[in-house]
Amino acid sequence: MTQEPMEGAEPMEGAEPMEATLPDPALASAVLEVEAHVGREGWDQPARLYALVDTERFVAAEPRMAEAMGIAETVVPGSLTAIEQEQYPAEQPVEQVLETIVWPPTVDGCCVVVERLVLPPEVDAEIPEDPAEAATFAREHPLRQEVRMVAGATRAGATYCALRLKAHDNEESVVDGTDLVPGLVELVLATLHDADDTGVQA
């Protein structure tokens, strides 16, 4: 678990912000399903990355895998299926990993799951500039909160997030919306852009 403050988590301190755009229901459903799935496995997990693919196309292309996942006979038109990717080295920050990824055209979207320590806005001025010192500061601060963040996006530009505090570890307390973690959302969206010479295809 990476232990440093992350920009964009402040909405956990209050009510869910008003959405500037209506969410994509297929993406929202996929993100919430991933959050619930990861949530059942507990805390202190490494970051996880999922490709999102059109369910009907996935069933047609990979019928055996779809059947093993229990979706071959329950296809909802327009829905997205999350397919977990291989884990990368735990010592490599997820932000760096996302900067190297370019998805193939068959992938319609993606989402990433990370755990972070976050602090309330009133202590921002006290956070050291040095990353190592900032991590120690967050880890030892009495007002720290552990939060799981799921950020997803599609090639069409839709985004959706789900956040869960360890202190309120139940599905009813999950906060969701289109842009709750802007920095992470931007990195996820960037993986869906056209490939360039520096990208590594997932």
Give the location of each predicted region.
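N-terminal interaction modules that seed assembly of large macromolecular complexes
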Residues: E33-Q87
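Glycine-rich, aromatic-bearing surface loops/beta-hairpins
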Residues: P121-A202
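Actinobacteria-biased recognition of intrinsically disordered, low-complexity terminal regions
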Residues: M1-V31, G39, E67-I71, H193-A202
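Internal, well-folded beta-alpha domain core
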Residues: S79-Q145
